[in-house]
């Protein structure tokens, strides 16, 4: 049996009596007690997540912008100011999603990317292949010397500033999807991005791994609650945010995964997968579902891989859970393209067909329920 990878915070999680699970080969906390309370902390105050299993990759060289024009489906032409970030899919030639990632622009010779843990080795191999094939001459450096802590919630930024006073001046004016580099803090040189995976405001802090446990403990002392993968999943589902490997993979087009907004077909550039996307178009709708109640009760919980029956054909739930914020069972589903918001569809739960209503994503954003 292969030993699990550990983040630099593994001992800290165990000291907090976290329930640990194998998450794609990483030993990660699923909760530290009440998952519901962790979820609520992020929606109402501030919670933090160890996301150090994700991999920071630095790209340097004179042709780094040209490389990303070709490598990703979104358009790095939008990245004009230092620290600006872009969410994109990395596609294969068939238009399938190799990974979803965030690209940060710092200078014309330095871009930084954060990729998912389970796909990191595959992504890096693909980047190296594209770099070699295109003769871009870039240096591509995975940075496992970094850890990442995501601090999320309406009070997250204030609590980060209380913990790292030097960060306030550099980040108080940051708009969402922008980052700043903050040098010389007690926790080393930090990259602080106004990004997240919860539907709340907050920061994701890239920190030298040798300093992350001290930062984690300091954030806790300033009232930030440690949160595990369980709350992270219910929060991202409420927020309408995809999980790689569950809502899309290398056989699924971003156009069929609710990610058309991340694909830029306007610029005349030859990015990997473009020809396949243009040839195939959109084949399915990616929608939200809310399980309908009868006599005030739902007959089950929506879960991944349940079949969805519609008048236009069958679909499938890709992610499902019970929403703590809504007190409803919610899901994402890939269904025939003719399915519309407001339609009632049937979901096969055990041996029953139960009605669910099609809604526009997201379900919740900034603490407010949007899908009723």
From Swiss-Prot:
Entry keyword set: Aminotransferase, Transferase
Segments crossing the lipid bilayer: none
Uppermost EC category: transferase
InterPro entries: GCS_T, GCS_T_bac, GCST_C, GCV_T_N, GcvT/YgfZ/DmdA, GcvT/YgfZ_C, TrmE/GcvT_dom1
Pfam family, one: GCV_T
Record-level Gene Ontology MF annotations: aminomethyltransferase activity; transaminase activity
Gene Ontology CC entries for this record: cytosol; glycine cleavage complex
Top-level division of the source organism's lineage: Bacteria
GO biological process: glycine decarboxylation via glycine cleavage system
Catalysis performed (reactions): N(6)-[(R)-S(8)-aminomethyldihydrolipoyl]-L-lysyl-[protein] + (6S)-5,6,7,8-tetrahydrofolate = N(6)-[(R)-dihydrolipoyl]-L-lysyl-[protein] + (6R)-5,10-methylene-5,6,7,8-tetrahydrofolate + NH4(+)
Its EC number(s): 2.1.2.10
Described function: The glycine cleavage system catalyzes the degradation of glycine.
HAMAP family in the record: GcvT (MF_00259)
NCBIfam families listed in its UniProt record: gcvT, PRK00389.1
Assembly and interaction partners: The glycine cleavage system is composed of four proteins: P, T, L and H.
Family: Belongs to the GcvT family.
Protein known as: Aminomethyltransferase
Organism, scientific name: Burkholderia orbicola (strain MC0-3)
Gene encoding the protein: gcvT
């Amino acid at each position: 049996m292969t030993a699990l990878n550990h983040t630099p915070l593994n001992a800290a999680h165990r000291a907090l009596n976290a329930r640990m699970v194998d998450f794609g080969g990483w030993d990660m906390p699923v909760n530290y007690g009440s998952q519901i309370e962790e979820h609520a902390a992020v929606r109402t105050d501030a919670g933090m997540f160890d996301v150090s299993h994700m991999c920071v990759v630095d790209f340097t060289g004179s042709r780094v912008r040209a490389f990303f024009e070709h490598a990703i489906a979104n358009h790095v032409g939008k990245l004009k100011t230092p620290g600006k970030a872009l969410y994109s899919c990395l596609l294969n030639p068939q238009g399938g999603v190799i990974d979803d990632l965030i690209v940060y622009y710092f200078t014309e010779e330095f871009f930084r990317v954060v990729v998912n843990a389970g796909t990191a080795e595959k992504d890096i191999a693909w980047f190296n292949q594209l770099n070699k094939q295109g003769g871009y001459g870039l240096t591509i450096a995975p940075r496992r010397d970094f850890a990442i802590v995501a601090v999320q919630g309406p009070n997250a930024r204030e609590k980060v500033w209380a913990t790292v006073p030097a960060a306030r001046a550099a980040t108080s004016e940051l708009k969402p999807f922008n980052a700043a580099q903050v040098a010389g803090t007690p926790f080393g040189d930090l990259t602080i991005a106004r990004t997240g995976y919860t539907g709340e405001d907050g920061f994701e802090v890239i920190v030298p791994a040798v300093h992350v446990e001290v930062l984690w403990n300091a954030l806790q002392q300033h009232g930030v609650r440690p949160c595990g993968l369980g709350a992270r999943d219910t929060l991202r589902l409420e927020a309408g945010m995809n999980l790689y490997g569950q809502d899309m993979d290398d056989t699924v087009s971003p156009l069929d995964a609710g990610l058309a907004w991340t694909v830029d077909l306007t610029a005349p550039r030859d990015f990997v997968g473009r020809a396949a996307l243009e040839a195939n178009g959109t084949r399915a709708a990616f929608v939200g579902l809310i399980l309908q109640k009868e006599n005030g009760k739902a007959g089950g919980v929506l879960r991944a891989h349940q079949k969805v029956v519609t008048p236009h054909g069958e679909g499938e739930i890709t992610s499902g859970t019970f929403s703590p914020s809504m007190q409803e069972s919610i899901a994402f589903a890939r269904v025939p393209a003719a399915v519309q918001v407001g339609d009632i569809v049937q979901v096969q739960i055990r041996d029953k067909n139960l009605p669910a209503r099609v809604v526009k994503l997201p379900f919740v954003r900034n603490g407010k329920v949007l899908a009723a």
